[in-house]
């Protein structure tokens, strides 16, 4: 690849960033120009001669306060640790636009991270056209020789969040704002419910699906609908703090997802799962630099620090904190597996037998709701 003049490159990059800021969530922009010439990716058996060029594709804005924010914090961590400046494109819809942008990034980068489930097939398509580029897709399950996946057992932290919710409710009615009825959201909803039931067998969890990852207005409306139905504690599998903010206005407790959201309503905050992507990004990019990278389906968790639990809100009692910390220690040690039988679905069918522990593959393919969840999975 020919190296572009620094002045021209900087101008192009600035123009792209300005375009991204203007269009916001309406439409993804062209991929940003590279700040240095991209080197050809080397075979996995030979170390890279130069530091690789890296790009990220984001579903939302880095300022969403949740999922994309945490990925962007991981990018910044990787840049600091490895001395690499990475490009990113934000607000990329899970549509043909994604494939176009991933393709453009692959033309000028050695490593492309695509950070949302809906990018899976688009990433796979582009990977087939650029065999010398490494692609890493978050939360998916399809791989290729030059494409791996990565995600974590965030359901472990959802279970712990459920313990807090189960202890803080006064009427045993919990609410859950879910993005899409896909396995990733379903197993987190189920884990949250099981955690709550472990300390309060009488709780019920009502779920509302928003069919969006990031739309604060829609998320807020879903939260209000749950509060109107009587829920006094909420958790959201969404990318913004809108659920927490809506709950706080009603004097209810709530937790968010992906990031520490306590600053938005510290007196109404529970806790929630938090992603720590930075160390993984360092590991993956370093492997490419060392020539040791190989395609894999990486799944982290609380034990390796990819998944964490946010600090507790101001009003969480010490005895509740201790319950959570004790369960957390058991999860990290392996003594506590979230999906251990007996577990029945909300139709009365036994899905996990007494003493049985679901494998990771079974968890990732979950398409049923546990007993206690009031709602259905839309078809």
Spans of model-derived segments:
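Intrinsic disorder/low-complexity detector
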Residues: 6-8, 19, 374
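A residue-level marker of the well-folded mature domains of exported/periplasmic proteins
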Residues: 26-379
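Bacterial N-terminal signal peptides that target proteins for export
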Residues: 2-12
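C-terminal motif of bacterial Sec signal peptides marking the signal peptidase cleavage site
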Residues: 20-24
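Hydrophobic helical h-region of N-terminal Sec-dependent signal peptides
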Residues: 12-18
């Amino acid at each position: 690849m020919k190296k572009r003049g620094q002045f021209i490159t900087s101008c192009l990059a600035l123009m792209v960033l300005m375009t991204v800021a203007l269009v916001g969530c309406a439409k993804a922009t062209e991929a940003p120009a590279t700040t240095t010439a991209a080197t050809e990716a080397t075979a996995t058996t030979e170390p890279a001669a130069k530091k690789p060029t890296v790009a990220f594709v984001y579903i939302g804005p880095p300022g969403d306060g949740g999922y994309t924010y945490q990925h962007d914090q991981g990018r910044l961590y990787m840049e600091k640790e490895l001395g690499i400046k990475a490009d990113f494109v934000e607000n990329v819809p899970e549509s043909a636009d994604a494939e176009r942008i991933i393709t453009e990034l692959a033309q000028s980068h050695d490593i492309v991270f695509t950070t949302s489930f809906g990018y899976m097939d688009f990433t796979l398509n582009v990977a087939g056209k650029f065999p010398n580029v490494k692609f890493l897709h978050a939360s998916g399950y399809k791989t290729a020789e030059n494409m791996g996946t990565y995600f974590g057992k965030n359901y472990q932290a959802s279970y712990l969040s459920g313990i807090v919710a189960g202890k803080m409710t006064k009427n045993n009615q919990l609410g859950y704002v879910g993005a899409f009825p896909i396995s990733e959201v379903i197993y987190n909803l189920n884990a949250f419910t099981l955690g709550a039931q472990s300390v309060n067998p009488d709780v019920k969890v009502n779920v509302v699906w928003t069919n969006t990852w990031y739309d604060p207005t829609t998320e807020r409306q879903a939260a209000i609908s749950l509060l109107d139905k009587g829920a006094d504690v909420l958790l959201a599998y969404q990318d913004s703090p809108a659920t927490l903010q809506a709950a706080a206005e009603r004097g209810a407790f709530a937790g968010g997802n992906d990031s520490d959201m306590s600053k938005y309503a510290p007196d109404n905050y529970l806790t929630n799962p938090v992603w720590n992507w930075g160390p993984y990004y360092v590991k993956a990019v370093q492997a490419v630099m060392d020539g040791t990278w190989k395609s894999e389906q990486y799944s982290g968790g609380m034990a390796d620090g990819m998944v964490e639990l946010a600090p507790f809100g101001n009003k969480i009692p010490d005895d509740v904190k201790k319950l959570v910390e004790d369960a957390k220690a058991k999860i990290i040690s392996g003594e506590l597996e979230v999906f251990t039988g007996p577990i029945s679905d909300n139709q009365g069918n036994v899905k996990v037998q007494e003493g049985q522990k679901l494998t990771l593959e079974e968890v990732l393919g979950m398409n049923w709701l546990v007993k206690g969840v009031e709602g259905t999975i839309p078809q």
